[in-house]
């Protein structure tokens, strides 16, 4: 489709088909459109509101150009959209490590900080993880430990074509939604935290279209009613569950899982050094109860979607066992050691 025809459709508020969107984003990734046209497409999509078909079309365009990495069919990703401005520590990253200690294979897709002071890549790098490990060695690490971190800029080199345009636009675009979806390992099991409750249904429908087998899309609230792209122990959490093509929705409270409420201030993070310290304290048992419970809640969800647990309650039991036995800490030390060894070869 010529970009003038594409722009005309978007200007009139017409939704694109999945095929049209895939062709459009393939053109964007390949640098076939002028920067001004790409900026217009992104802004008009945002104004119109994206559909699941459009999100899925963009997904297929981006994933087809990602560096391939083979991590099997059962790996789980815990990744949020960011954008909630809450300043929490790296909850989903700690949750992934705890779940891995419970036997859950993890393919954590992440990046450096965009909307916070410390992204998942920043905190892992602070702890010594070599985030630029190439795909073949990442596969070796995963085979030995069941854990891999997939640094988004390494696996999505074509995304560089739009990075400066996104910065110049300075608004949320469809790319903010796509981040958690375009895991280069093509995971079928996910826990996705979203910053805006209004996009939960779009996410769920998009996940079905991209081949998801079991996922939880979550949006939490603070004690003040502000949104979080995490499951919350400060207030209620809405969970949209996708399993075998079916979508269900329910709201839960911390007390549903015998978790104590806390304030958002108790979950505040900081720079990579501060967040790395919190992560290690959670693993060694010296963190606050609020910090530990927040990580356990998200880890429980990862255990559930992996199939290692029959429900979130059972997942919480598995996650607690991972921490209390010391297995999460030992496993993470093993991951760091092997990661460094592979990076040095």
Curated annotation (Swiss-Prot):
Binds 2 magnesium ions per monomer. Mg(2+) 1 binds at residues 92, 230. It holds the Pfam family Glycos_trans_3N. SUPFAM superfamilies: Nucleoside phosphorylase/phosphoribosyltransferase catalytic domain, Nucleoside phosphorylase/phosphoribosyltransferase N-terminal domain. Gene3D superfamilies: Nucleoside phosphorylase/phosphoribosyltransferase catalytic domain (3.40.1030.10), Transferase, Pyrimidine Nucleoside Phosphorylase, Chain C (1.20.970.10). Pathway: Amino-acid biosynthesis; L-tryptophan biosynthesis; L-tryptophan from chorismate: step 2/5. GO terms for cellular component: cytosol. It catalyses: N-(5-phospho-beta-D-ribosyl)anthranilate + diphosphate = 5-phospho-alpha-D-ribose 1-diphosphate + anthranilate. Anthranilate 1 binds at residues 80, 111. Its cofactor is Mg(2+). Anthranilate 2 binds at residue 166. Keywords: Amino-acid biosynthesis, Aromatic amino acid biosynthesis, Glycosyltransferase, Magnesium, Metal-binding, Transferase, Tryptophan biosynthesis. GO terms for molecular function: anthranilate phosphoribosyltransferase activity; magnesium ion binding. It is an enzyme of class 2 (transferase). One of its GO terms (biological process) is L-tryptophan biosynthetic process. 5-phospho-alpha-D-ribose 1-diphosphate binds at residues 80, 83-84, 88, 90-93, 108-116, 120. Mg(2+) 2 binds at residues 229-230. Its EC number is 2.4.2.18. PANTHER family: ANTHRANILATE PHOSPHORIBOSYLTRANSFERASE. Homodimer. Belongs to the anthranilate phosphoribosyltransferase family. Catalyzes the transfer of the phosphoribosyl group of 5-phosphorylribose-1-pyrophosphate (PRPP) to anthranilate to yield N-(5'-phosphoribosyl)-anthranilate (PRA). This is Anthranilate phosphoribosyltransferase. It comes from Chlorobium phaeobacteroides (strain BS1).
């Amino acid at each position: 489709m010529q970009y003038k025809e594409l722009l005309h459709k978007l200007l009139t508020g017409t939704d694109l088909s999945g095929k049209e969107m895939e062709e459009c984003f393939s053109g964007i990734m390949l640098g076939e459109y002028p920067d001004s046209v790409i900026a217009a497409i992104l802004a008009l999509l945002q104004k119109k509101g994206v559909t699941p078909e459009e999100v899925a079309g963009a997904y297929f365009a981006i994933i087809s150009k990602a560096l391939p990495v083979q991590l099997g069919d059962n790996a789980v990703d815990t990744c949020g959209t960011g954008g909630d401005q809450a300043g929490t520590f790296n909850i989903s990253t700690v949750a992934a490590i705890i779940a891995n200690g419970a036997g859950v294979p993890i393919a954590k897709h992440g990046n450096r900080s965009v909307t916070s002071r410390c992204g998942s890549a920043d905190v892992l790098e602070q702890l010594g993880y070599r985030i630029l490990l190439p795909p073949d060695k990442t596969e070796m690490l995963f085979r030995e430990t069941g854990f891999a971190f997939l640094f988004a800029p390494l696996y999505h080199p074509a995304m560089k074509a739009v990075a400066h345009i996104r910065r110049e636009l300075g608004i949320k675009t469809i790319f903010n939604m796509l981040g958690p979806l375009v895991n280069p390992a093509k995971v079928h099991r996910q826990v996705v935290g979203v910053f805006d409750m209004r996009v939960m249904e779009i996410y769920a429908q998009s996940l079905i279209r991209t081949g998801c087998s079991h996922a939880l899309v979550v949006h939490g609230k603070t004690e003040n009613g502000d949104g979080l792209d995490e499951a919350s122990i400060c207030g209620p959490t809405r969970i949209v569950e996708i399993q075998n093509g079916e979508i269900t929705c329910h709201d839960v409270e911390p007390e549903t899982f015998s978790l104590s409420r806390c304030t958002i201030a108790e979950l505040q993070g900081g720079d990579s050094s501060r967040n790395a310290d919190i992560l290690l304290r959670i693993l060694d048992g010296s963190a606050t109860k609020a910090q530990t419970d927040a990580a356990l809640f998200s880890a429980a969800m990862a255990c559930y979607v992996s199939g290692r647990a029959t429900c979130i309650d059972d997942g919480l039991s598995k996650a607690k066992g991972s921490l209390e036995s010391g297995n999460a800490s030992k496993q993470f030390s093993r991951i760091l050691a092997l990661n460094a060894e592979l990076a040095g070869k």
